[in-house]
Amino acid sequence: QLSITQPAVSQHIKALEQELGVRIFERIDGQLIVTKQGEEVVKCAKKMLGLYNNLRQNLRDSRRLTTHLTIGVTHTAESNPIAEALAKYCAANEGISIKMITDTISNLYTMLNTYELDLAIVEGRIADPNIHYLLLDTDYLVLAVSVNHPFAKRSMVTLNELKKERMILRLPDSNTRNLFVAHLESNNMSISDFNVVLEIDNMATIKDLIRRDFGVSILARSVCLDELKKGKITVLPVENLSMMREINIAYHNDFTQFDVLHDIMKVYNETLRIYA
């Protein structure tokens, strides 16, 4: 894409290394490996590229009287009413265009810091002085079961009862899974005490398998609202596990379109009323 030869690339890298006074790459066993200092260079380069792309997009938007937003969401947020709320926000505001990217929470924060994202919808928050938050909602984890499951008629289940069930869980790097594991550990239990038969990253697949009684799962209640309204699955709390968390809109500290934040929040709350 740059239309330059490999020797020219090597020359540019060498010149940059001399200018910065660091080694960006090291050759180990015939492979080029990025050094620790090189990782910092790459990180800053991504940030500069993100800022440049934002500048170009903002200039185009100002000419066309449009607004383009790139919003990152976790797999949980993708499956709750936030996607519907963003679609309604675009439909109600001519000139607004949103690109929605789904990724892990750690990758979303990285993209937020490198200006690849304007906003991120995340569960919880981290201590980062560059990131600010607006509380969007409060969510909690529940046990999700088929409407034909014996638990469906119960108001609560115990952890010991849950040990006997076939469990379908999110992957180990998911925030939902980690919150469940943390609460198990606070009760002197481990995930290995449970019969985990499937680990899946796709929320829709998990809910479909639950509905067809292939197992039970621990999910955020917000991702089950549509199924609950249609009577497709049942959710209930687990005794001694109060797995609550915040859903936040995260944004960089130099983000200035606060009207967008509050408009999204308003549409989200209006969308929630449909499922009340």
Residues of each region from the PLM?
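Secondary-structure junction motif
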Residues: 167-188, 258, 265, 275
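Alpha-helical linker/hinge and terminal dimerization helices associated
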Residues: 17-20, 41-63, 264, 268
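A late-sequence structural motif
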Residues: 81, 234-276
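Hydrophobic hinge/microswitch elements
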Residues: 104-117, 122-123, 176, 182-233
